[in-house]
Amino acid sequence: MKVSCEDVNGPRSSLGRAWNHVSWLYYQYLLVTALYMLEPWERTVFNSMLVSIVGMALYTGYIFMPQHILAILHYFEIVQ
C-alpha cells in the first residue's frame, strides 16, 4: 500500500505542500538532466559524483577566495 504525503499530512497542510513542491523540484531535476532514463544505481553514481564535485568546489572557494580577494585588494592598493 502506497502512502502519499496527503494521507499523512492532509492535502492542505504546509508540510504536505512543501513535500509536494520538493517532489516537483526533484522531478524537474530528473527531467532536465535526463536522469529519469538511468537505472537507480546509475543515478546514485551520478548524484554522488555531482555532490562530490560541487562540495569540492565550494570548499576550495571557501578556503582560497579570501586570499585571492585580499591579493586583488592589495594589487589595486585599496587595502594597505
Swiss-Prot record:
Keyword Endoplasmic reticulum: yes
TM region(s), chain numbering: 22-38, 44-66
GO BP annotation list: ceramide biosynthetic process
Membrane-topology descriptor: Multi-pass membrane protein
The protein's annotated pathway: Lipid metabolism; sphingolipid metabolism
InterPro entries in alphabetical order: Ser_palmitoyltrfase_ssu-like (IPR024512), SPT_small_subunit (IPR051900)
Single GO MF annotation: serine C-palmitoyltransferase activity
Taxonomic superkingdom: Eukaryota
Chief location bin: endoplasmic reticulum
Keywords recorded for this protein, A-Z: Endoplasmic reticulum, Lipid metabolism, Membrane, Sphingolipid metabolism, Transmembrane, Transmembrane helix
Record's subcellular location: Endoplasmic reticulum membrane
Keyword field contains Transmembrane: yes
Residues in the Cytoplasmic compartment per record: 1-21, 67-80
Pfam families: SPT_ssu-like
Site annotation Within the serine palmitoyltransferase (SPT) complex, defines the length of the acyl chain-binding pocket, determining the acyl-CoA substrate preference: residues: M37
GO CC terms, sorted: endoplasmic reticulum membrane; serine palmitoyltransferase complex
Sequence ranges on the Lumenal membrane side: 39-43
Quaternary structure and partners: Component of the serine palmitoyltransferase (SPT) complex, which is composed of SPTLC1, SPTLC2 or SPTLC3 and SPTSSA or SPTSSB. The heterodimer consisting of SPTLC1 and SPTLC2/SPTLC3 forms the catalytic core of the enzyme, while SPTSSA or SPTSSB subunits determine substrate specificity. SPT also interacts with ORMDL proteins, especially ORMDL3, which negatively regulate SPT activity in the presence of ceramides.
Listed PANTHER family: SERINE PALMITOYLTRANSFERASE SMALL SUBUNIT A
Assigned protein family: Belongs to the SPTSS family. SPTSSA subfamily.
Functional description taken from the UniProt entry: Component of the serine palmitoyltransferase multisubunit enzyme (SPT) that catalyzes the initial and rate-limiting step in sphingolipid biosynthesis by condensing L-serine and activated acyl-CoA (most commonly palmitoyl-CoA) to form long-chain bases. The SPT complex is composed of SPTLC1, SPTLC2 or SPTLC3 and SPTSSA or SPTSSB. Within this complex, the heterodimer consisting of SPTLC1 and SPTLC2/SPTLC3 forms the catalytic core. Within the SPT complex, SPTSSA stimulates the catalytic activity and plays a role in substrate specificity, which depends upon the overall complex composition.
Record-given protein name: Serine palmitoyltransferase small subunit A-B
